């Protein structure tokens, strides 16, 4: 049986669970595959991707900080990827790269189906404006978010994301220093990498951001999610959710694009959550 070659590219990448997830999906679905992880800095991404193709690579996932760089290498793009301006799934089609973004679908499926949240009518705060934020923002809007406020330490990037989303009546950008003046939100999504540079003793957000039904969601998982989730628990947020479920769901979407069949995510999520999942409240 021929073995298909896939990979995940990121920087850093040693923490990635994607190889394990896709290997388990392949075993479940009877698909022979070889899935590797490559630690690649942004300036070396294009060359590394060309080498991967030369060695038989036919599909790849892309994580931070390469999602916008992946967008640039694509000859064709899905509507979701084009709207996001970021790519997390690459497929080799007729000798060129086709780009897709499954992050938003993975997040919404995890929140609505696994955690039972109804996103319709919620006011959302999105922290961050990089590749991770770009991937999930369109899907959150499509899921019925009433208003989205984007806050980023570099306000220019928040403005760029607002412009790309093209919904000025629903989406606005504010400064990080304005957080205490924004009112409360039913959904707070951390799409930053702040968990890699902060600890639970120093990370904090204004308590005024919360109401009685707020869901605090970190797109990170494991140690990178600890500071944000620790804050959310400390201020008694109603729902506290890490990014592990989103990771598994977006991986299943990528697997389906490559192999034409969507695996069952619950068995994989259950095992990984027992090992890596942060304590949650949902």
From Swiss-Prot:
Shikimate binds at residues 16-18, 63, 88, 103. It comes from the Bacteria. Its EC number is 1.1.1.25. Pathway: Metabolic intermediate biosynthesis; chorismate biosynthesis; chorismate from D-erythrose 4-phosphate and phosphoenolpyruvate: step 4/7. One of its GO terms (biological process) is amino acid biosynthetic process. NADP(+) binds at residues 128-132, 243. GO terms for cellular component: cytosol. Belongs to the shikimate dehydrogenase family. This is Shikimate dehydrogenase (NADP(+)). It comes from Xylella fastidiosa (strain 9a5c).
